[in-house]
UniProtKB/Swiss-Prot annotation:
Described purpose of this protein according to its UniProt entry: ATP-dependent specificity component of the Clp protease. It directs the protease to specific substrates. Can perform chaperone functions in the absence of ClpP. Degrades anti-sigma-D factor RsdA when present in a complex with ClpP1 and ClpP2. Does not seem to act on anti-sigma-L factor RslA.
Protein species of origin: Mycobacterium tuberculosis (strain ATCC 25618 / H37Rv)
Subunit structure: Component of the ClpX-ClpP complex. Forms a hexameric ring that, in the presence of ATP, binds to fourteen ClpP subunits assembled into a disk-like structure with a central cavity, resembling the structure of eukaryotic proteasomes. Forms a complex with ClpP1 and ClpP2. Interacts with RseA but does not seem to help degrade it.
Similarity comment: Belongs to the ClpX chaperone family.
A GO cellular component entry from the record: peptidoglycan-based cell wall
NCBIfam families: clpX, PRK05342.1
Protein name per Swiss-Prot or TrEMBL: ATP-dependent Clp protease ATP-binding subunit ClpX
Residues that coordinate or bind Zn(2+): C13, C16, C35, C38
Keyword Chaperone annotated: yes
Location of the ClpX-type ZB domain: 1-54
Binding-site list for ATP: P122, T123, G124, C125, G126, K127, T128, Y129
Length: 426
């Protein structure tokens, strides 16, 4: 029963038995009562069951062509990188499911090894964004780590296990879900050792970090401090198996193209030589011919390279691609700023030559797609400051002159309504 005592008025939860005074809220139903704590517990159970149901099944796993098509909606260009990533990600999650089925099968299982991904390419060309978009499509936990902050265990800096903590946090501390997530390690070229020969002195932020990453890249049972920071003997650890975690490591690898050119051979001189414009050279895939020996010469250790069998490279974006990035993707910058202005009741328009001028500036600055937002902020700052305080603006037009000559955008005044005209005449 829901009442305590023979004639008492004190109600209690029909499920946990706690009295009205022991809980925050008691909700009544036909002959029963339920407390807020039991409701929270029910919600947690339902969420866990739904999360288990949301696990990617092989028949539901998007095919490589579907993954590439999804990426096309968000990322402009980089077709080779999209294809490489689509195949690698599809095979990775297929491998996880093959492992689960293999445990239940009577046939002799074939163990499929993990294929982590190495992404090479200049800054601002979409490496991070490609990985983020992939994680969003697959609905798996995703974490980004910066390799420059990592040091070997026992030295000032972050331990490599802190990368895994970020993934666990992204999965809301659901370790089982985190164990099939994606970790993106950026700036990996900055942990290259200083020369291709093994160092006699300790290189704690270069070769030492590469050595520390080997085990978690390959797959190991790692102990992660729940609060981050350094390990100490008297704390509890979160245990996570990295066997099914997909690692995508990326970097700009400035100078690697020279190493590749030295190996491949310099282009010939004279009448028979191929002449290419600067624009063609800038957008060439310098890393298409990369070999493991080039990466070793750059400063990565052979064991580290061996754990990154899939190599995807991105190229510098040309003017046409940058213009498309501004206007075509689902969350394009132009669409974002149009929405911001709409919230103030003002229409925003960019002329075609204005978009080309913004792309030219990004190329001139050498910041790639990452620099587009900074340029647009500079261009729109004066009107974004004034417009919220004004009610006489209908439209703002950004032209080529606005971008190149730093002049104010064209402001189209709002026509007064009939009632406003009547008030003025009165």
């Amino acid at each position: 029963m829901a009442r305590i005592g023979d004639g008492g008025d004190l109600l209690k939860c029909s499920f946990c038995g706690k009295s009205q005074k022991q809980v925050k809220k008691l909700i009544a139903g036909p002959g029963v009562y339920i407390c807020d704590e039991c409701i929270d517990l029910c919600n947690e159970i339902i969420e866990e069951e739904l999360a288990d149901a949301d696990d990617v099944k092989l028949d539901e796993l998007p095919k490589p062509a579907e993954i590439r098509e999804f990426l096309e909606g968000y990322v402009i260009g980089q077709d080779t990188a999209k294809r490489t990533l689509a195949v690698a990600v599809y095979n990775h999650y297929k491998r996880i499911q093959a492992g689960e089925k293999g445990r239940d099968s009577r046939c002799e299982p074939v163990e499929l090894t993990k294929s982590n991904i190495l992404m090479l390419g200049p800054t601002g060309c979409g490496k991070t964004y490609l990985a983020q978009t992939l994680a969003k499509m697959l609905n798996v936990p995703f974490a980004i780590a910066d390799a420059t902050a990592l040091t070997e265990a026992g030295y000032v800096g972050e331990d490599v296990e802190n990368i895994l903590l970020k993934l666990i946090q992204a999965a809301d501390y659901d370790v089982k879900r985190a164990e099939t997530g994606i970790i993106y390690i950026d700036e990996v070229d900055k942990i290259a050792r200083k020369s291709e020969n093994p160092s006699i002195t300790r290189d704690v932020s270069g070769e030492g970090v590469q050595q520390a990453l080997l085990k978690i890249l390959e797959g190991t049972q790692a102990s992660v401090p729940p609060q981050g920071g350094r390990k100490h003997p008297h704390q509890e650890f979160i245990q996570i198996d990295t066997t099914n975690v997909l690692f995508i490591v990326a970097g700009a690898f400035a100078g690697l193209e020279k190493i590749i050119y030295e190996r491949v051979g310099k282009r010939g001189l004279g009448f028979g030589a191929e002449v290419r414009s600067k624009a063609e050279i800038d957008t060439t895939d310098h890393f298409a011919d990369v070999m493991p020996e080039d990466l070793i010469k750059f400063g990565l250790i052979p064991e580290f390279i061996g754990r990154l069998p899939v190599v995807a490279s991105v190229t510098n974006l040309d003017k046409e691609s940058l213009v498309k990035i501004l206007s075509e993707p689902k969350n394009a910058l132009v669409k974002q700023y149009i929405r911001l202005f709409e919230m103030d009741g003002v229409e925003l328009e960019f002329t075609d030559d204005a978009l080309e001028a913004i792309a030219d500036q990004a190329i001139h600055r050498g910041t790639g797609a990452r620099g587009l937002r900074a340029i647009m902020e500079e261009v729109l700052l004066p009107v974004m400051y004034d417009i919220p305080s004004r009610d006489d603006v209908a439209k703002v037009v950004v032209t080529k002159e606005t971008v190149q000559d730093n002049v104010l955008p064209t402001i189209v005044p709002r026509k007064p309504s009939r009632s406003e005209r009547r008030d003025k005449s009165a």
